[in-house]
């Protein structure tokens, strides 16, 4: 009988910093695009955009914190 269970993927964190940096850049671009769209938005839409951009800024801070953690882990050889 064959084993139908999949093997778990190895924990490859080697490119996490780069992925997180890309996520920060993409989020910043989304904020800028949203700000540009406010020119044509209603007051209600502007409020939603501002709220969403506030959440995006919180995400950026979290990403940056994670980048610091991952950079430190990389320097320490990813040891737990």
Curated annotation (Swiss-Prot):
Swiss-Prot/TrEMBL GO biological process terms: asexual sporulation; sporulation resulting in formation of a cellular spore
Subcellular location: Spore core
InterPro entries in alphabetical order: SASP_thioredoxin-like
Record's note on what induces expression: Expressed only in the forespore compartment of sporulating cells.
Pfam families assigned to the protein according to its UniProt record, in alphabetical order: Tlp
Bias (Basic and acidic residues): 34-73
Keyword set, alphabetical order: Sporulation
Superkingdom as given in the UniProt entry: Bacteria
Chain intervals for the UniProt region annotation (Disordered): 34-80
Family: Belongs to the Tlp family.
Family annotation (NCBIfam families): SASP_tlp
UniProt name for this protein: Small, acid-soluble spore protein Tlp
Classification lineage: Bacteria, Bacillati, Bacillota, Bacilli, Bacillales
